[in-house]
């Protein structure tokens, strides 16, 4: 544990630049969180160097306090003392000392090998600069040879074998006992042969030491790529040893087998990879121990991102997907996407050690929704109909060749699918819109209530039936008309249900069905099953996880410190109550000011328009023409003052579309467009919102300015930076509260109220807080990307009288709430805006 005074004045965090005061405060706070075993919640606005601060503070602590983890050895020593009380203590202590010395020696040998690789790589780089043509020619030749080898291994097959054999289910499945689960059942992609190979990778005396590490996770691979680039900025020489980093990713991102990586969907790619491990023509990149060792050491010797790991795998002809896993034990930083850390099955498959390690979750503003989404699944009526068609056709084709066990389970699955379809049809006939249901109500006919969904789900996992059926369906689709006639006949039969649509029966849906059955076979008490009907005749069933706390509990119990970070974490109450309610004494909140001076930001609350129409953009006032016309006049006034680009966020597409419709009818659109070209985000699936943003950006960059209309929660509200001229003003129309009539939202609210009652808290107050927090987190995320650097400036304009409530203003980020200008009338708002930009123009 560190001394608070020492941390308070600590300045050396190995930062590559001279850090600002707010960055020093951030790093000191994170350092303390790790040292004291806290759960940190860090808010650092976009543009304040958050990622680099996270890296520097955590690596500094690790360099000063971290070390080799000897947990396994110490446990072994404890076992010796428990089982053999006759062994003197001094013998046990000596044994532990020998083990520690051995680990240190192994660690030293690892560092020696890595240093030799670094020198060799530097020599290679020097040669490249001297003779780049030769190097590229050799690289190209190696890649061509690797592709040829891949093609030969994947396509070489025994021509005497019936092509149908590939799709026949042959797996033997027996219902496991409680104490005896198949080791390969939940291994998330490792075949037994690969698991054995990885277990036997090295003899004990050459196994790399397990070192204390930082698990750094974020939502997307691109965010993790950026993180690795930030780590590269650090000067290795200032640390006691060069930084060892490894990036874990999915097969889709790391596979170098060209015949496999092109497969879609991702589930097909995963299944093909596993299949090639056990086949006679195994993947040529799944190499033996020595080559895996080489990959591991090369990956640790230099800081590599995903693309560089793929290039390394191609150069060494070793699978990066499995090779990176061998580097985890000795890495100081492991970067990985959310699912690999937050799903238990993924952690077990990767054999990740949580105990005493440090966990940093970046871009954590949507962590609650992300965890719930990972452990939820849905299936639509159309998908169920397609699944029934495909399963019946598959069963007709292979029934006589299936053994009794497989025949029984496939018939059970068909029965379950039939019951799902019957449930949908009954809901459609009774015009049911939405409701919460229980699993038992889905399985009511033909003896389906006697089927053990848990065992059936396990059978699907072991047998790989979904891949077999999807593969067979694609194969049938590729054949001539004679084979297609039977499927087309089935299509006519299956889909002549009066619903006015036909669906292509060749669409792969069995993987989706398997995922859905897995969830309803193991329903968590904190989850709910819903029936939903939105538009048309394609309702869906959805299993939704309501309480994510169980999935972070193991992190807080085992990790030394868990730290959440984001540009806009406010309001943080939900993180505490929904994720860490039993760990509140460990919570360390931190929110820093923005890097820009206060005079570069103005926040204006607008309660009414120029005509005096009160601004309260509720759902029931969506069609209020007077309200929308006065909103248009407000924009006309504002954009006469605001230079360059203006971004406007609406609470929903329906609100945006209705506003544009009213403006077009009253000539407001033309008047707006005369001052600034208008760009409107579309809801249409075929339109790419990034194209809209690119056109807006081109207009602003060309000096024509622009006004971009977007939607909170849409593609343009996250991940895009509206810095400098792209966002001299960011406006938010209304407040994006969730739909209180939505059945899923009602279930979430009920769950929050139940939990509040259990803790003796006012239930209605808790649900109201949850309601407001959900809204304000979305608002904060949308407006948080306007300022990107110290010299940037922008106005934040919130158009709704409800923003004047003190309970709402408290949920704004600290850096934004310190300079709020509010008035009941429109005049002061326009004057404040003019004053702000007049001052900025004088500075320019």
From Swiss-Prot:
Q: Does the keyword Phosphoprotein apply?
A: no
Instruction: Please provide the Gene Ontology terms (biological process) for this protein.
Output: DNA-templated DNA replication maintenance of fidelity; establishment of sister chromatid cohesion; interstrand cross-link repair
Q: What is its EC number?
A: 5.6.2.3
Question: Residues that bind ATP, according to the entry?
Answer: 44-51
Renumbered residue ranges of the record's region Disordered: 118-161
Q: Where is the composition biased (Polar residues)?
A: 124-134
Q: Where is the composition biased (Low complexity)?
A: 149-160
Location of the motif DEAH box: 362-365
The protein's superkingdom reads: Eukaryota
Location relative to the cell: Cytoplasm; Nucleus
Main subcellular localisation: cytoplasm
What are the required cofactors?
A: [4Fe-4S] cluster
Question: CDD domains recorded for this chain?
Answer: SF2_C_XPD
Q: Where is the Helicase ATP-binding domain?
A: 9-418
What is the catalytic activity of this protein? Couples ATP hydrolysis with the unwinding of duplex DNA at the replication fork by translocating in the 5'-3' direction. This creates two antiparallel DNA single strands (ssDNA). The leading ssDNA polymer is the template for DNA polymerase III holoenzyme which synthesizes a continuous strand; ATP + H2O = ADP + phosphate + H(+)
What's the record's note on cofactor binding?
Answer: Binds 1 [4Fe-4S] cluster.
- The positions annotated for binding [4Fe-4S] cluster are 255, 273, 283, 319
Q: Which SMART domains match?
A: DEXDc2, HELICc2
Provide the alphabetized UniProt keywords: ATP-binding, Cell cycle, Cytoplasm, DNA-binding, Helicase, Hydrolase, Iron, Iron-sulfur, Isomerase, Metal-binding, Nucleotide-binding, Nucleus
Keyword Cell cycle (UniProt): yes
Q: State the family named in the UniProt similarity comment for this chain.
A: Belongs to the DEAD box helicase family. DEAH subfamily. DDX11/CHL1 sub-subfamily.
Please describe what this protein does: ATP-dependent DNA helicase important for chromosome transmission and normal cell cycle progression in G(2)/M. May have a role in changing DNA topology to allow the loading of proteins involved in maintaining sister chromatid cohesion in the vicinity of the centromeres. Has a specific role in chromosome segregation during meiosis II.
Q: What is this protein called?
A: ATP-dependent DNA helicase chl1
